[in-house]
């Protein structure tokens, strides 16, 4: 299914606090060592902890890795157990993140869903979804065209910006990403 998502730049960078990551280039304009980000999150409602999560991104001169995990905790586990892990790995070429692999496992109650995607040059080479997505007349079938020039959901959340000191510059926010998550293909457009 193809669909679109439009965010303002301010909303996109608000997502940075929840997992979207902006990484800066070196002053020379080339790919300089990027560094590592580790973030831990607690989800609360009226002071009651309902969940927790972690997000780790490690970006170097020529490769990157991102891992996220989360789970329900405390009172929320009484009503529904849930946990998940996602990971993406890829290459950095000419200041562009090129995903190579993506995996995701999400368990809610007794149901587990797994997604595995292998990519090369922005094209999906292989993917597997367990359990398979049931056919539906309301769902647009995935074609080969939907699997070209795409990012996985995690790699799409990484934004490379120039090291000019202004992460919220309008040009940094004008981005478009075609995303394939194993079940559907959708667009994410960021605007200032």
Please place each PLM-identified region on the residue numbering.
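Amphipathic/hydrophobic helical signal segments and adjacent flexible N-terminal regions
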Residues: 4, 25-29, 179
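N-terminal cleavable signal peptides for secretion/export
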Residues: 25-114
């Amino acid at each position: 299914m193809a669909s679109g998502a439009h965010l303002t730049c301010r909303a996109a960078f608000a997502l940075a606090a929840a997992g979207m990551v902006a990484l800066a280039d070196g002053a020379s304009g080339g790919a300089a060592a990027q560094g590592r980000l580790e973030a831990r999150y607690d989800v609360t409602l009226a002071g009651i902890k309902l969940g927790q999560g972690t997000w780790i991104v490690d970006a170097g001169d020529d490769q990157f890795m991102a891992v996220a995990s989360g789970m329900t905790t405390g009172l929320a586990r009484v009503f529904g157990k849930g946990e998940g892990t996602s990971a993406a790995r890829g290459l950095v070429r000419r200041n562009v993140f090129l995903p190579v692999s993506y995996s995701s496992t999400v368990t809610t109650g007794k149901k587990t869903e797994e997604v595995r995607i292998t990519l090369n040059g922005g094209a999906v080479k292989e993917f597997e979804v367990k359990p398979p997505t049931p056919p539906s007349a309301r769902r647009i079938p995935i074609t080969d065209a939907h699997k070209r020039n795409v990012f996985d959901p995690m790699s799409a959340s990484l934004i490379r910006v120039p090291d000019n000191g202004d992460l919220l510059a309008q040009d940094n926010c004008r981005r478009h990403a075609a995303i394939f998550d194993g079940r559907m293909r959708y667009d994410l457009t960021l605007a200032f």
